[in-house]
């Protein structure tokens, strides 16, 4: 009964049209969640969310706890980690060429191109390319921190801190409630003409070998 009542509590936000998700390609909801991760993490340069952790679109209408659980059913924890730009580029290049869920980024534009038969990622902030040795503070979740980001962290994870960190649902609930109303077609989350992570083709990206 307690759990049922908790899931029925209103989330404080209302959607005007569904905020759509996607697994293979960039979509509004993972981008929005990456934005909120960054906003919820003091000092974060980047927000990074995995589309595989977003299970349904955010439907139109009032957001209740049950819907929030359905969108993010996993108890992933919100973490702040540090990686160099070169490491983040490597993670994004590998993801672009893979078949797992795409990664959603906030705070940077990640331009993915083919160069000499290899996948190249250029990270830009306000139009300027970041040098490889730039250290970035990334707001993400423990799934990514223990997975593709792990080998690129500037310092090892503190497992006690991971266990004490809030779940994504708890961390983002307040952020979502403060927004009041969401438009499913809001170009801040996804603009097909100006994606956050433009690619030379659909995932998995395959770069032809140089002649």
Where are these regions (language model features)?
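Glycine-rich phosphate/diphosphate-binding loops and the adjacent beta-loop-alpha structural elements
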Residues: 8-28
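Feature captures C-terminal
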Residues: 27, 31-211
